[in-house]
From Swiss-Prot:
Keywords: Disulfide bond, Endonuclease, Glycoprotein, Hydrolase, Lyase, Lysosome, Nitration, Nuclease, Signal
Reaction(s) this enzyme catalyzes, per UniProt: an [RNA] containing cytidine + H2O = an [RNA]-3'-cytidine-3'-phosphate + a 5'-hydroxy-ribonucleotide-3'-[RNA]; an [RNA] containing uridine + H2O = an [RNA]-3'-uridine-3'-phosphate + a 5'-hydroxy-ribonucleotide-3'-[RNA]
GO MF annotation, one: lyase activity
Subunit structure of this chain's protein: Interacts with and forms a tight 1:1 complex with RNH1. Dimerization of two such complexes may occur.
Function, in words: This is a non-secretory ribonuclease. It is a pyrimidine specific nuclease with a slight preference for U. Cytotoxin and helminthotoxin. Possesses a wide variety of biological activities.
Designated gene of the protein: RNASE2
Protein name, UniProt field: Non-secretory ribonuclease
Length: 158
């Protein structure tokens, strides 16, 4: 009986650990609105190598981010996608604030390959042209006033 109880307690602790990791991935730095954080993480008009580009994201986190996608387009172009028809978010079916880009854009997918020490994160880069799906919300007072609805989350690429 004791080994089973001990094993189940470990499983519960592991589950809470995994949930806290997942929740921590959703945390943004307080000084940014969700749209500003989206822009930092996902908008890159001129492609850079991932190891360099990811420094701008990792400086706000206590660890190397495992993966990230940069859209090579402008924030204004992504804001325009927010005007497309609402769809259920492919990665979170409980949300209906997603929008399909309708056109492919060049993008870079970054994947952590090297040491996970924050001062020395190393990434591989994969280039592609793909559609994307973003979640959009009403603007925060810190967001540009010309955009009443802004992108806040890159849900998926297709």
């Amino acid at each position: 009986m004791v080994p089973k109880l001990f094993t189940s307690q470990i499983c519960v602790l592991l589950l809470f650990g995994l949930l806290s990791v997942e929740v921590s991935l959703q945390v943004k730095p307080q000084q940014f609105s969700w749209a500003q954080w989206f822009s930092i993480q996902h908008i890159q008009t001129t492609p850079l190598h991932c190891t360099s580009a990811m420094r701008a994201i990792n400086r706000y986190q206590p660890r190397c981010k495992n993966q990230n996608t940069f859209l090579h387009t402008t924030f204004a172009n992504v804001v325009n996608v927010c005007g497309n028809t609402n769809i259920t978010c492919p990665r979170n079916a409980s949300l209906n604030n997603c929008h399909h880009s309708g056109v492919q854009v060049p993008l870079t997918y970054c994947n952590l390959t090297g040491p996970q020490t924050i001062s020395n994160c190393v990434y591989s880069s994969t280039q592609a042209n793909m559609f994307y799906v973003v979640a959009c919300d009403n603007r925060d007072p810190r967001d540009p006033p010309q955009y009443p609805v802004v992108p806040v989350h890159l849900d998926t690429t297709i």
